[in-house]
């Protein structure tokens, strides 16, 4: 049975993890270009969510949001690849730890489930969109 949290807590957890990653990269000192790449990834995700098509069926909604989510992670890993101080490894570690939080309705649960059983999470889709938007707003205020 997973931990049940509302959208505010989910966005707070994501914001803390992103802040932790930024601090780790900033401490490395040799990865200055990574901030531009990571920022571009966040902006791309934000643009995708802001231009989210309305009126799609549930299956298409999930597929669309999960595509945005996976694109964000791929973009982030690409942006961190050039950093020699282990930022990519840190990001992968944070991603794995986030999956282990087992927060019901999280994008990791919605998009990463290998069993394809995303049906019960469909009502949580608007909350996920709002919480992700809140996390992006929190990030941009840093």
Swiss-Prot record:
Residues 1-27 form the signal peptide. A lipid is attached at residue 116 (GPI-anchor amidated glycine). This is Neuritin. Component of the outer core of AMPAR complex. AMPAR complex consists of an inner core made of 4 pore-forming GluA/GRIA proteins (GRIA1, GRIA2, GRIA3 and GRIA4) and 4 major auxiliary subunits arranged in a twofold symmetry. One of the two pairs of distinct binding sites is occupied either by CNIH2, CNIH3 or CACNG2, CACNG3. The other harbors CACNG2, CACNG3, CACNG4, CACNG8 or GSG1L. This inner core of AMPAR complex is complemented by outer core constituents binding directly to the GluA/GRIA proteins at sites distinct from the interaction sites of the inner core constituents. GO terms for cellular component: AMPA glutamate receptor complex; extracellular space; glutamatergic synapse; plasma membrane; presynapse; side of membrane. It is found in: Cell membrane; Synapse. Promotes neurite outgrowth and especially branching of neuritic processes in primary hippocampal and cortical cells. One of its GO terms (biological process) is neuron projection extension. It is a lipid-anchor; GPI-anchor. InterPro entries: Neuritin_fam. Its main location: membrane. Keywords: Cell membrane, Glycoprotein, GPI-anchor, Lipoprotein, Membrane, Signal, Synapse. Belongs to the neuritin family. Residues 117-142 form a propeptide. GO terms for molecular function: identical protein binding.
């Amino acid at each position: 049975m997973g931990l049940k949290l509302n959208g505010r807590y989910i966005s707070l957890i994501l914001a803390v993890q992103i802040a932790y990653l930024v601090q780790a990269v900033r401490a490395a000192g040799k990865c200055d270009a990574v901030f531009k790449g990571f920022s571009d990834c966040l902006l791309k995700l934000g643009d995708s969510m802001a231009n989210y098509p309305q009126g799609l069926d549930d299956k298409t909604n999930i597929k669309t949001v999960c595509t945005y989510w996976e694109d964000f992670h791929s973009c982030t890993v690409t942006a961190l690849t050039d950093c020699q101080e282990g930022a990519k490894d840190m990001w992968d570690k944070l991603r794995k730890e986030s999956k282990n939080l087992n927060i019901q309705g999280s994008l990791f649960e919605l998009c990463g489930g290998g069993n394809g059983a995303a049906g019960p999470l469909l009502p949580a889709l608007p909350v996920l969109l709002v919480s992700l938007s809140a996390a992006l707003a929190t990030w941009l205020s840093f």
